[in-house]
Amino acid sequence: MRTISNQKYEITDMAHEEYPFLHRIRALRDICGEIRAGDIGGFVEGESNLSAEPGDCAWIFDDAIAAGDAYVDRDACLRGDAIACGSAYVSKGSVMSGHSRAEDNAYLRGASMTGKALASGNAQIIHDPHTMGTPILSGNCKVYGTVQGDIHITGSAVILPCEEVRNDTRDTFVLSGKSRSVIRGIGRETLQPLQKEVSPMKTKTPKKRGVER
């Protein structure tokens, strides 16, 4: 079943064993090289869970689930047994895999979640647009606050609702349980010569009497 405007995928009658209100999707055409027409995907509750835009590579693979008011778009994907539910928004190339879960009003933008990582409450897991740093959640970590930039939250680390962990540097910050460490960026220890801008030569014209050059 699909709407007339959805030429990307259809919702099949293959129901989830535990949650029969969820059904698998099937690709109606080739999608971004990895998905072929006829390929079976993961589970959705309705078309409101996955973008149907023709040029959008967003997809739900394997046994992953998008349910409730959760929405996956802009080249993001769910793999493995990942779950996006509640009003979670997974976007901008984000990848959820393993048994990771995004729920409530969690927002993922250019982020990666794996293992049993949890993004809950009003969590925001977003990449840094300047450094292009990507936040990674793994292990059994739980994030309720904001994580931005090249930060790896892992182990049993917990980011509380009032906490903001931002990284606008070229290094990688690692938070694992109660420990914190830094992985220096490539080439950060090497000194480089100053790159001076060479200003173009200006041609001077003869100054006429009473006229500024």
Give a label for each model feature.
Residues 1-57, 63, 81, 87, ...:
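Terminal amphipathic alpha-helical/low-complexity segments used for targeting or macromolecular assembly
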Residues 48, 58, 64, 70, ...:
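Residues at the loop-to-beta-strand transition
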